[in-house]
């Protein structure tokens, strides 16, 4: 609420995000889902001590994301939670918390703070810890990517999401491909779908 009030007061869009939800396992998927005013959280944080992958009893950040979005979209009828990536750099001259481990790529008309924030609010961005995409589009219920492939590197794209209805598995894999131009056509029973490129 305070972020929204500040944005209105300044007449500028402001994007706030929840940092490293698994640092000390601070948040559950239910808590992430229920704060519907929060639209962004760190699905990837490059700091080595934030429990990105979870442990044997707690979900990793991507699983938290799927669980939270299943609740938001399926039960609360709320907007989805978007995932951002950051490097969380603490040092700039060596060490294991240096810059360049995670970032976002925003599809905006030009490099302008307001346009970047507005594009993020519309979900027109992707998060990365290494892969670059030439294109991302979602039209006519078709999600299409074009991976900027590097010579000698192979890529795998998994389409992950949650279906509508009781008993649906949060974070189900809907498909996988090794193509540089992966495509997913919605069947109509998905709450959401996201692409994971490795």
Task: Give, region by region, the residue ranges found by the protein language model.
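A metal-dependent hydrolase metal-coordination microenvironment
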Residues: 1-36, 44-51, 56-64, 71, ...
């Amino acid at each position: 609420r305070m972020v929204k009030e500040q944005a209105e007061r300044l007449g500028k869009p402001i994007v706030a995000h929840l940092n490293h939800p698994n640092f000390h396992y601070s948040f559950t998927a239910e808590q992430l889902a229920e704060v519907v005013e929060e639209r962004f959280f760190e699905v990837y944080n490059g700091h080595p001590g934030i429990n990105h992958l979870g442990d044997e009893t707690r979900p990793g950040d991507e699983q938290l994301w799927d669980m939270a979005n299943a609740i938001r979209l399926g039960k609360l009828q709320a907007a989805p939670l978007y995932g951002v990536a950051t490097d969380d750099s603490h040092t700039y001259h060596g060490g294991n918390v240096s810059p360049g481990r995670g970032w976002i790529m925003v599809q905006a008309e030009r490099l302008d703070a307001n346009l970047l924030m507005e594009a993020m609010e519309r979900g027109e961005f992707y998060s990365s810890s290494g892969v670059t995409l030439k294109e991302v589009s979602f039209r006519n219920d078709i999600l299409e990517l074009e991976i900027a492939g590097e010579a000698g590197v192979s890529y795998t794209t998994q389409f992950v999401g949650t279906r509508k209805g009781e008993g649906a598995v949060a974070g189900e894999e809907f498909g996988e491909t090794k193509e540089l131009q992966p495509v997913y056509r919605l069947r109509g029973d998905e709450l959401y779908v996201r692409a994971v490129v490795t």
